[in-house]
């Protein structure tokens, strides 16, 4: 569909708005003023700067200073978008320092370029203000150095040569912000920016929403993988994507003298307008194009397609099944899909090629920054890390190059018939495709069928025998370990849990469901039941029994016994009536039950529990999966660390190791473990630091979203610390108690020390416990792990990130 846009009324208004003689400048100096009715034009007479009104009928006196295309008329930049002038007495002045200053008739400043610029003012030599032929309003030092330019401060429009992205050195970010309405240029509901977590990707977000609205995807050398319309434009435009340690940006330039602009409108649509030969703006394409373009409409491992009724339809990728059969429809599509056959890294998973896909969300990905790895190199790297779920080339030109790895579920995919990219997904079986045309004979088929039946019968019989043998062997192993651990029979546990009734279901752990139960003597228990289809659960079960059986500490959950029957394995723990920590801190209503005293008690308790594992138990134990969901709370809200299935023990002075099988929870893993498989006691320290920040803020690290930037929780808190800004915390009554604020700030300081990038920089848990118990000065933290230097928002908060003891009722200052 093509649309033609014209605003002749605005043009007529601009011509007639001034009662005095209108002047058209080519250059403005500090000695000159741009009055309402005057204009500043580009050398080629394509762009103009001046005053205009957007609402002639209801608000004709509301005037804006902005840049526009002269013919056909289109506003591309507005200076005072938040603060319109009233009447036609406003004027623009260029100061001797090169600052643009907008005043009303009473000489009150309404806007200045210095308020938007991050550059420090300096003495300017003969500053000039002019418009380039590309539409860039430039304040320059004479004819050379740029003091300020409008291209650094986009509004809702991107012109040829402008950038979208981020300069990490100067902290300059280039993003689009929609207008509120067609007649109100103040910031609207939508922003378009470059997300630099993992492989950079263009994302559209509705302000205030935690998730994306639309993801144009990552750059693959030719276009963004979620914007096929841009791929179709390759003959009209040259696209440029720059990625370095200092800057990541995207820009475009037209071919064949095409005049074009990209506009983010007030409804969240990205429009490409092209000037026609008839001198009109024609809508060339729109993104999102259809409902399937909206973010993760079908959930994990699913693709969206438009059906014959022109409505979205979700389907699982081949080899996957709906996560919830009852809820698998378009209204509940976000539930997504799961593997039909679970992956099992130890049994050498296969990678299956899925062609023509929109690359999944790369927020939690790793990529080859130098773009030098081959696809085979990429496969080897992904295969060596059990947490790697898929891989692909970063650049599809010249046969493909570069490496992109995903960790976690793959979301926001769709299939394209003539667009998209190959993605290689980890599967729990080797997929073999037969493409031959020969017809198999009936005799051969019969023989094969009989052989298959015999093999299946033998396999079932052998499995039954092996189940009994393994169960008995495991039971003997437990007894030989002399663990002094009661072994319950299955009947007792079945009676205690009312045959594992749904009413007694407490939740799902790493390897299976957990049920509440009550023994005959009245003791309440929690039964962790190993899931039958858990590929790695038996080994973790054995590990957990052997590790925790003889551990005794008030901040560790107590193991009461186990149950083994065949390959059915269950752990019986003391029951924690208040569930887990995440049940409280991440819920707005329930979090009010945790005042600061209780939160601090939980922090101290977890610290003492980890210290016991690292230093005071008979073996040095690294938990490897410390998170809010694995901290249980008793009747008095005392914390108890649970779930030792992934823990590793060491004897003597050993305190670190490496593995190819990276397991745990992303968001809590330190970088050296998640990327290289290297873990140590400092891995738990990192997880503990993340947990402390989550307890204080009530936000999850990995799921943290902010309307104004793409930082995770660690990056968000770190930026607030470095810039002496304030941090958001729950609106709780305990924040009104001035006496707790120094303690809260000290906890944040300690947490930042725990999550530092390098393990050798992190304190030991013994040092952490001492830090909490004293008022001694703390070292300055360095940059945390998994931090990328991105945009920092304006925060309204109740704590200033300072660690010294200068206290006031509303704010803390000084570090």
Swiss-Prot record:
Domain PAN residues, every copy: 345-428
Membrane side Cytoplasmic: residue ranges: 460-815
Main location: membrane
Domain EGF-like: 288-326
UniProt cross-references to Pfam families, sorted A to Z: B_lectin, DUF3403, PAN_2, PK_Tyr_Ser-Thr, S_locus_glycop
Coiled coil: none
Residue segments, region CaM-binding: 589-606
Active site: 625
Sugar-modified residues: 93, 249, 265, 329, 385
Source organism phylogeny: Eukaryota, Viridiplantae, Streptophyta, Embryophyta, Tracheophyta
Extracellular side: 23-438
Record field: transmembrane: 439-459
Catalysed reaction equations from the record: L-seryl-[protein] + ATP = O-phospho-L-seryl-[protein] + ADP + H(+); L-threonyl-[protein] + ATP = O-phospho-L-threonyl-[protein] + ADP + H(+)
Assembly and binders: Interacts with PUB9, PUB13 and PUB14.
Keyword line: ATP-binding, Cell membrane, Disulfide bond, EGF-like domain, Glycoprotein, Kinase, Lectin, Membrane, Nucleotide-binding, Phosphoprotein, Receptor, Serine/threonine-protein kinase, Signal, Transferase, Transmembrane, Transmembrane helix
Bilayer topology term: Single-pass type I membrane protein
UniProt-recorded name of the protein: G-type lectin S-receptor-like serine/threonine-protein kinase SD1-1
Signal peptide: 1-22
GO cellular component, one term: plasmodesma
């Amino acid at each position: 569909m093509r649309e033609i846009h014209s605003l002749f009324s605005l043009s007529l208004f601009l011509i007639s708005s001034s009662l005095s003689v209108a002047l058209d400048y080519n250059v403005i100096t500090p000695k000159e003023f741009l009055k309402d009715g005057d204009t500043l034009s580009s050398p080629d007479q394509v762009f103009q700067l001046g005053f205009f009104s957007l609402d002639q009928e209801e608000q004709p006196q509301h005037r804006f200073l902005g840049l526009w295309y002269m013919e056909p008329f289109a506003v591309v930049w507005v200076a005072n978008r938040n603060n319109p002038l009233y009447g036609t007495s406003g004027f623009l002045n260029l100061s001797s320092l090169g600052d643009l200053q907008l005043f009303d008739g009473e000489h009150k400043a309404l806007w200045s370029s210095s308020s938007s610029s991050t550059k420090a003012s300096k003495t300017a030599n003969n500053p000039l203000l002019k418009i380039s032929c590309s539409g860039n309003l430039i304040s320059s030092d004479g004819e050379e150095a740029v003091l300020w330019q409008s291209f650094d401060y986009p509004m809702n429009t991107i012109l040829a040569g402008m950038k979208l992205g981020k300069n990490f050195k100067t902290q300059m970010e280039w993003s689009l912000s929609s207008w509120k309405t067609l007649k109100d240029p103040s910031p609207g509901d939508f922003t378009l920016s470059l997300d630099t977590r993992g492989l950079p990707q263009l994302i559209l977000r509705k302000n205030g929403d935690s998730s994306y609205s639309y993801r144009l995807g990552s750059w693959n050398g030719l276009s963004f993988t979620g914007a096929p319309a841009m791929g179709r434009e390759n003959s009209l435009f040259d696209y440029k994507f720059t990625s370095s340690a200092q800057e990541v940006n995207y820009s475009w330039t037209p071919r064949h003298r095409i005049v074009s602009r990209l506009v983010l409108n007030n409804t969240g649509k990205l429009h490409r307008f092209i000037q026609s030969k008839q001198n009109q703006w024609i809508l060339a394409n729109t993104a999102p194009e259809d409902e399937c373009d909206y973010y993760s409409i079908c959930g994990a491992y699913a693709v969206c397609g438009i059906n014959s009724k022109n409505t979205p339809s979700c389907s699982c990728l081949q080899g996957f099944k709906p996560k919830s059969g009852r809820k698998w429809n378009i209204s509940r599509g976000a539930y997504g899909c799961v593997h039909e056959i679970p992956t099992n890294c130890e049994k050498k998973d296969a990678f299956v090629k899925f062609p023509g896909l929109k690359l999944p969300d790369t927020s939690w990905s790793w990529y080859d920054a130098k773009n030098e790895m081959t696809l085979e190199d990429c496969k080897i790297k992904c295969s060596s890390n059990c947490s790697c779920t898929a891989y692909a080339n970063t650049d599809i030109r010249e046969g493909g190059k570069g490496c992109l790895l995903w960790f976690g579920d793959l979301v926001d995919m769709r299939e394209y018939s003539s667009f998209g990219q190959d993605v290689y997904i980890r599967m729990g079986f080797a997929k073999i495709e037969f493409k031959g045309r020969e017809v198999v004979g009936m005799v051969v088929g019969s023989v094969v069928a009989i052989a298959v039946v015999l093999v299946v019968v033998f396999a079932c019989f052998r499995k039954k025998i092996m189940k009994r043998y393994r169960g008995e062997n495991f039971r003997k192993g437990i007894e030989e370990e002399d663990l002094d651990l009661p072994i319950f029979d299955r009947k007792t546990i079945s009676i205690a849990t009312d045959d594992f009734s749904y009413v007694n279901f407490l939740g799902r752990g790493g390897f299976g469901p957990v049920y509440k139960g009550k023994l005959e003597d009245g003791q309440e228990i929690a039964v962790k039941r190993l899931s039958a289809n858990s590929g790695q659960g038996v080994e973790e079960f054995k590990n957990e029994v052997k590790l925790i059986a003889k551990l005794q500490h008030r901040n560790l959950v107590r193991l009461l016994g186990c149950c083994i029957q065949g390959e059915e394995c269950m752990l019986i723990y003391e029951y924690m009536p208040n569930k887990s920590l995440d049940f409280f801190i991440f819920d707005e209503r329930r979090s009010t039950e945790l005042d600061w005293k209780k939160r601090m008690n939980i922090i101290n308790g977890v610290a003492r529990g980890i210290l016991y594992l690292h230093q005071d138990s008979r073996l040095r134990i690294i938990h490897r999966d410390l998170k809010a969901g694995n901290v249980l709370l008793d009747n008095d809200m005392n914390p108890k660390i649970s779930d030792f299935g992934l823990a590793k023990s060491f004897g003597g002075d050993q305190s670190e190791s490496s593995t190819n099988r990276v397991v745990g929870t992303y968001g809590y893993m330190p970088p050296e473990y998640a990327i290289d498989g290297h873990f140590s006691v400092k891995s738990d320290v990192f997880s503990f630091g993340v947990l402390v920040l989550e307890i204080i803020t009530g936000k999850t690290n990995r799921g943290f979203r902010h309307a104004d930037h793409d930082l995770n929780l660690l990056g968000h808190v770190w930026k607030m610390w470095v810039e002496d800004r304030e941090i958001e915390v729950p609106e709780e009554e305990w924040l009104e108690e001035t006496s707790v604020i120094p303690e809260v700030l000290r906890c944040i300081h300690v947490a930042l020390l725990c999550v530092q990038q390098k393990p050798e920089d992190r304190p030991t848990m013994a040092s952490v416990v001492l830090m909490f118990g004293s008022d001694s000065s703390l070292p300055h933290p360095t940059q945390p792990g998994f931090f990328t230097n991105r945009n920092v928002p304006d925060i309204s908060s109740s704590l200033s990130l300072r660690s010294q003891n200068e206290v006031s009722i509303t704010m803390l200052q000084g570090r």
